[in-house]
Amino acid sequence: MIRISDAAQAHFAKLLANQEEGTQIRVFVINPGTPNAECGVSYCPPDAVEATDTALKFDLLTAYVDELSAPYLEDAEIDFVTDQLGSQLTLKAPNAKMRKVADDAPLMERVEYMLQSQINPQLAGHGGRVSLMEITEDGYAILQFGGGCNGCSMVDVTLKEGIEKQLLNEFPELKGVRDLTEHQRGEHSYY
């Protein structure tokens, strides 16, 4: 479910040494499955452990996950990274905003999941997003851009060189992608 690197475990163990005996960590998601989902880590004293929690035992600590957060923390990674600027704890949870779909789920669900978990986070850096409107009978994913992507002069490159390549690589049953957006250049446009 969650991978915690050795460096992160050592960091947590150091912090836990200063807490009440038996205190561990809790990993959670607030607003799971929504665009506003946020992940966090907190101390979990022994009296805060719930019967429905999942206990994930690691070499140096135990991480508790509540029942509601568990499916959204699938494939999550916690690391403690040190570089020239200092050190920081990172928590990557690709499924926090949308629950991972099964490999045998309908194509529409699998494409939507990839858009939300992999492509939209990249577009968000420019204030943009893309939505799946439909998949045609002849195998084309019909997309609609919004935010900074609407009217952006680079949208064709983003569509063909970025999104289409990723989708066709992941879903060979697709023939291509088409843009349904009526692009209107404005102050919201990124380029």
UniProtKB/Swiss-Prot annotation:
Output this protein's name. Fe/S biogenesis protein NfuA
Self-association state and partner proteins as the record states: Homodimer.
NCBIfam families registered for this protein in UniProt: PRK11190.1, YhgI_GntY
Reported consequences of knocking out the gene: Cells express the stationary phase-specific competition-defective (SPCD) phenotype and are unable to catabolize dsDNA.
What cellular component GO annotations does this protein have? cytosol
Essential cofactor(s): [4Fe-4S] cluster
Family the entry assigns: Belongs to the NfuA family.
Q: What does this protein do?
A: Involved in iron-sulfur cluster biogenesis under severe conditions such as iron starvation or oxidative stress. Binds a 4Fe-4S cluster, can transfer this cluster to apoproteins, and thereby intervenes in the maturation of Fe/S proteins. Could also act as a scaffold/chaperone for damaged Fe/S proteins. Required for E.coli to sustain oxidative stress and iron starvation. Also necessary for the use of extracellular DNA as the sole source of carbon and energy.
**GO BP term, example:** carbon utilization
GO molecular function list: 4 iron, 4 sulfur cluster binding; iron ion binding; iron-sulfur cluster chaperone activity; protein homodimerization activity
Q: How is the cofactor bound?
A: Binds 1 [4Fe-4S] cluster per subunit. The cluster is presumably bound at the interface of two monomers.
What's the short name of a Pfam family annotated to this entry?
Answer: Fe-S_biosyn
Any idea which positions bind [4Fe-4S] cluster? Answer: C149, C152
Q: Which keywords, in A-to-Z order, does the entry hold?
A: 4Fe-4S, Iron, Iron-sulfur, Metal-binding, Stress response
Q: Which HAMAP family match?
A: Fe_S_biogen_NfuA
